[in-house]
Amino acid sequence: MKFYTYSGETAAEALKIAQSHHGVDTLVFKTQEIRKKTLTSSGLYEIVVAVEEEENKKAPLIPESLYDEELNEEDVVMQLSSTVEEMRKLAGVSSNQRNYTFSKNKTLLEKDAPLEDTPLEANKQDALLQALKDEANHKKEREKREVKQEEEIKDINAQLSKIRDSLKLIQNMFWDEKNPNSVNIPQEFAEIYKLAKQSGMKSSHLDEIMQLSLELMPLRMRENSVTIKRYFREVLRKIILCRPEDLNLRQKRILMLVGPTGVGKTTTLAKLAARYSRMLAKKYKVGIITLDNYRIGALEQLSWYANKMKMSIEAVIDAKDFAKEIEALEYCDFILVDTTGHSQYDKEKIAGLKEFIDGGYNIDVSLVLSVTTKYEDMKDIYDSFGVLGIDTLIFTKLDESRGLGNLFSLVHESQKPISYLSVGQEVPMDLKVATNEYLVDCMLDGFSNPNKEQA
């Protein structure tokens, strides 16, 4: 006995092809759906038929004219006997695919010798039945082995995860700062403690956060390093303050950027101007005023950006001129004010900016800081410029820093929210609205530029 495989878009089509090669009395060994029919592709069915090696080429015992003339595509297989019916069930073939109907010349069929009574047909059916049983048994055994293998793989992965956690705990037993003076850190927290400390966070702030985590974290969560990191991440998120971008303008917004030299105030202002005027769903009217008349090339740099974006730019020297330009830009939704960079130790020049801020206008003051600055210097800068009434913090050069712990410490200490982050040199793309999720990811997983990831 030989087995042949045929395929078609439907089971009936595959059976027709098989019958065209081997006759209408072909015995079906197996029917299988290979691919379901979808909107974009046709279905695919596979049928396996069993044929005697010396195929009987004679005319079939029952002429085709004896079949019901109204047979549909699904009524394609003759019901030979109860034995064949049992074989059909073992093969898992739908009864609709194997049902033969007889409506004409029934007496003639009864007079003819039954096919199953002949030795040839009986042997064929016995062999096919045994083959079907063997196939069913093999399938069950194969399924059992696959289920067992999947369970073994899951068990191995779980054991490997426990081994990795155990190795981390063993390694952390020998860490240098196992017992800080202020907080007794358990070994299972050593990995996250070292990550946070290497980021540049102030020790007292880190100890405070660790103490908070130890007090609030359930004991059952401490057995897994992934769970510990996830919990610590949530604690940091709650500590960091970020101000959402407010575009519901009831009146024009005046934003002034202040800060020390070299932190990127002018470039950040150009990014903000492009964002408000071009990159948002609504295109806002933007005007620029610069107080930076001392730095060589500062006005030219800003004028170049303003000309590219087709917006007005004015340079002023004193508070009187400043007031005039504010009135002249009354039509704008946003007025962005660039200032001269001053050292945090030049108290006199910093105080000189107050006369512009105290002119009766509602000015939103943002202190621009570079994350490449160490925490102690950041704190000095914030204290010096704090006399101007800082509303938000803008951090630049995130792409040039290896850690953001100093940023976390300053925000935690000052309780001032972060509004924007500069994540690269490209104008206007590399400006991001600050979110605590992004900052925590950068701190614990390393910096990533969201614009380049999307590209």
Swiss-Prot record:
Main subcellular localization, coarse class? membrane
Superkingdom of the source? Answer: Bacteria
**Binding annotation for GTP:** 259-266, 338-342, 396-399
Q: Does the keyword Membrane apply?
A: yes
The entry's keywords: Bacterial flagellum biogenesis, Bacterial flagellum protein export, Cell membrane, GTP-binding, Membrane, Nucleotide-binding, Protein transport, Transport
Q: Does the keyword Manganese apply?
A: no
Any one GO CC term of this protein is: plasma membrane
* Gene Ontology biological process terms in this record: bacterial-type flagellum organization; protein transport; SRP-dependent cotranslational protein targeting to membrane
One family from Pfam that matches here is: SRP54
Places the protein is found: Cell membrane
Listed GO MF terms = ATP hydrolysis activity; GTP binding; GTPase activity; signal recognition particle binding
The way it spans or sits in the membrane comes to:
Peripheral membrane protein
Any idea what job this protein has? Necessary for flagellar biosynthesis. May be involved in translocation of the flagellum.
Similarity annotation: Belongs to the GTP-binding SRP family.
Q: What is this protein called?
A: Flagellar biosynthesis protein FlhF
Question: What species is this protein from?
Answer: Helicobacter pylori (strain J99 / ATCC 700824)
